[in-house]
UniProtKB/Swiss-Prot annotation:
Its main location: cytoplasm. Gene3D superfamilies: 3.30.160.20, 3.30.70.1660, 6.10.140.1950. InterPro entries: PCRF (IPR005139), Pep_chain_release_fac_I (IPR000352), Pep_chain_release_fac_I_sf (IPR045853), Prokaryotic/Mito_RF (IPR050057), RF-1 (IPR004373). GO terms for molecular function: translation release factor activity, codon specific. This is Peptide chain release factor 1. HAMAP family: Rel_fac_1. The modification N5-methylglutamine is found at Q235. Belongs to the prokaryotic/mitochondrial release factor family. It is found in: Cytoplasm. Methylated by PrmC. Methylation increases the termination efficiency of RF1. GO terms for cellular component: cytoplasm. Residues 281-311 are annotated as: Disordered. Residues 281-307 have a biased composition (Basic and acidic residues). It comes from Rhizobium meliloti (strain 1021).
Length: 360
């Protein structure tokens, strides 16, 4: 295990105490808001540091008691009994502190752009893409996040050939970022008379939602085309050219949005374009650090098959961490915290292992 950065811990405690004192002194509203934000950010790690310091002091007292020949038998027995419990507590706190001190992904607190596309499997793939979107919608609702569809192309038998949505809320990207990749489904389609199991797939991409401050899109780098919005069966929704297609000339990225308002369409298309460019920049930076990777979870390879949903067995398997759960019905209703937490824990463990290697 990596060593705890004692100096950094002391500095965090010192800063936390300074913030507490300044908040108690009655600063202006603007200053108070900034202090409160930093306070809430530091509070989890400082509370663990204080618990760790208390436990290490307790262990030192136990060691002194056991080393003192004047300690009577009852007290010695009690100290011997408490020692392993305190040592176990210290070990757990060390790991929690190390995780809290891991470098933060700058995008973790952002909202996200969720893109789901039907892959191999025809109509069944589109239906599965629809099921995945519903799963994420339910999950978002359970977290108090807001989902807004930016564009959707429906499948002939239902579901979606493609659907793009924003998922807005604090920390959305940190919870959904490991969902990117190929999701495979094994089930008997409703139209299958013989009861044969079919395999199909959908691709999920989760991008951190970029703001104008994150990525600068120059006007001369984009081409904006307008066209008529189409409804079901290709019927024109209105007589105006409201749909918008934006092409980013340097990269060739094309984004479309086809709601009724041209102004809204341009804003939504720019929102997706910025996020894709921001994601490209993040992936470029990640690939430069790829030699440091210790976990499949964080690879972000969207062509990688990451998960299988086997409906006949009620089984979900995440292939990156060899996790299998037999509660597929509940997970399709949005109860995916178990797999999200396991993926996050695996990623954190890999980062801790890397930190330990660098210190050796």
């Amino acid at each position: 295990m990596a060593k705890l950065p004692v100096e950094k811990m002391r500095e965090l405690e010192r800063r936390f105490g300074e913030i507490e004192a300044r908040m108690s002194a009655g600063p202006s509203a603007d200053v108070y808001v900034k202090l409160a934000s930093e306070y809430s950010e530091l509070q989890p790690v400082v509370s663990k540091i204080r618990a760790y310091e208390k436990a290490t002091a307790e262990l030192a007292d136990i060691a002194a008691m056991l080393a003192d020949r004047a300690t009577d038998k009852d007290m010695r027995d009690l100290a011997e009994m408490e020692k392993p419990e305190v040592e176990e507590k210290i070990e757990a706190l060390e790991q929690e502190i190390q995780i809290l001190l891991l470098p933060k992904d700058a995008a973790d607190e952002k909202s996200a752009i969720l893109e789901i596309r039907a892959g191999t499997g025809g109509s069944e793939a589109a239906l599965f893409a629809g099921d995945l979107f519903r799963m994420y919608e339910r999950y978002a609702a359970s977290k108090g996040w807001r989902v807004e569809v930016l564009s959707a192309s429906e499948g002939e038998a239902g579901g979606y050939k493609e659907i793009i949505a924003t998922v807005s809320g604090r920390g959305v990207f940190s919870r959904l970022k490991f969902e990117s990749g190929v999701h495979r489904v094994q089930r008997v389609p409703e139209t299958e008379a013989s009861g044969r199991i079919h395999t199909s797939a959908a691709t999920v991409a989760v991008l951190p939602e970029a703001e104008e401050i994150d990525i600068d899109v120059r006007p001369e780098d984009i081409r904006v085309d307008t066209m008529r919005s189409s409804g079901a069966g290709g019927q024109h929704v209105n007589t105006t050219d409201s749909a918008v297609r934006i092409t980013h000339i340097p990269t060739g990225i094309v984004v479309t949005s086809s709601e009724k308002s041209q102004h809204q369409n341009r804003a939504k298309a720019m929102q997706v374009l910025r996020s894709r460019l921001y994601d490209m920049e993040r992936q470029r930076a990640d690939s430069e650090r790829s030699a440091d990777r210790r976990s499949q979870v964080g690879s972000g390879d969207r062509s990688e098959r990451i998960r299988t949903y086997n409906f006949p067995q009620g089984r979900l398997t995440d292939h990156r961490i060899n996790l299998t759960l037999y509660k597929l019905d509940r997970m399709m209703e949005g109860e995916i915290d178990d797999v999200v937490d396991a993926l996050l824990a695996d990623y954190q463990a890999s980062q801790l292992a890397l930190l330990g290697e660098r210190q050796n």
